From Swiss-Prot:
Encoding gene per record: XOAT14
Residue positions of motif DXXH motif: 450-453
Organism: Oryza sativa subsp. japonica
Topology, Cytoplasmic side: 1-54
GO MF terms, alphabetically ordered: O-acetyltransferase activity; xylan O-acetyltransferase activity
Protein name: Xylan O-acetyltransferase 14
Amino acid sequence: MTTTGSTPPRKNRSNVTGGEGGSLEEYAWRAAGEAAAAKKATRAWGVSVSLRSHFSSLVLLLLLLLVALAVSATTKNGDPAETPHAPPLPPPASIKLPSSSSSGGGECDLFSGRWVYDEAAYPLYRESACRVMSEQSACEKYGRTDLRYQHWRWQPHGCDLPRFDAEKFLGKLRNKRLVFVGDSLNRNQWASMLCLIDTGAPELHTSINSSRSLTTFKIHEYNASVDFYWSPLLVESNSDHPLRHRVADRTVRAASINKHAAHWTNADVLVFNSYLWWQRPAMKVLWGSFDNPAAVVAAAAEEGDEYAVSKVIDSLRAYELAVRTWADWMEFHVDRARTQLFFMTMSPTHLRSDEWEDAAAAAAGGNHGCYGETEPIAAEEYRGTSGTDMAFARAVEAEARRLGERSVAVRLINVTRLSERRKDAHPSVHRRYWDPVTDEQRRNPSSYADCIHWCLPGVPDVWNQLLYAHIVS
């Protein structure tokens, strides 16, 4: 039995709390764990003694104070066996690194800057030189002749973005595993990382192996791997198949992530993203199983719970539930002393040209998306409206702050603002098509232009330079 409820009104986006206050049964185990921890702490303090003199009382009280301090130190997070670890870095939307400018001093916000045309130093590699180039990103191969999009360098205000050095990066990655987890935009970034490594150290022995949702790029001399795991909605969903994921009735199991986590639980560096696949008014959330729905339906009917199977809810609320599940897993399973966690902010789309064109041009030409665009948007203050929903960003920020309070550091890599200006850097019509282009599409190229993903070399290389700066610096 599937129950479809009406979509609740979108909450005030200035007050997104990342799922605080939810009453789902799936999170009952957290309350039980907290109660057990409280009970344990109560037992630790429940000491009764018989004192014979004021002097012995003072000595005993001092001893109890020392014991209490020891108990407090070893029972942080309710786990006395937990390995001590350093306090985490703060997880704001913008991460600041020491300035590398000649003026020196202070810190530099790598996410605030401008695009500078630099034909001498960019791109970081040639498309034809990358032996592992993605067919979806090979814009030059598929007919794009205006190559200015390859030569733009991101210039932060007050410092320089470190140039990607493959040998230095692999030195940090020796005997380690880096995993990108997310949707096709995270795969876009993973493909960029492979090209940066492949062209930066072409003499190395590398190999690629795929097993369903997991693809592994192995650098044998370093015993290192850079993997991509397909998980477009972070939690389990009916879009998890790496090829057959275009489904009309998109459904998520907002409280279930273990099936995915099994594939990246031993990673040393994890890079997550999830946004694009949530861009619809409502989402069906399933509390049963994709594998045995009949049994779940029968159990729900027997218990008289009409919402035990599924319910259609506002997509933002579903996203908050999913990100909370992700954060809960990180809190209780990640190795704080070993694993570095990153979350990429929203990659913007350029589907509506009227967002950057003046009114007259928009009225005369109609909407053409990114088709025919060859230059970035110059205005630093430009903000797109249709391609990014900041309420989703705030949901991630809220969970990152919550994890930070629990000594789990998540660095948010803010690629949204710098990428918003690059309307020129999408594949548009210059990519491989898995289905033949129709005559109608040929008459109106903008109707099938890809204004979501990115050409390589291009914008995702800058994302990886930002990631590189955090890992290496």
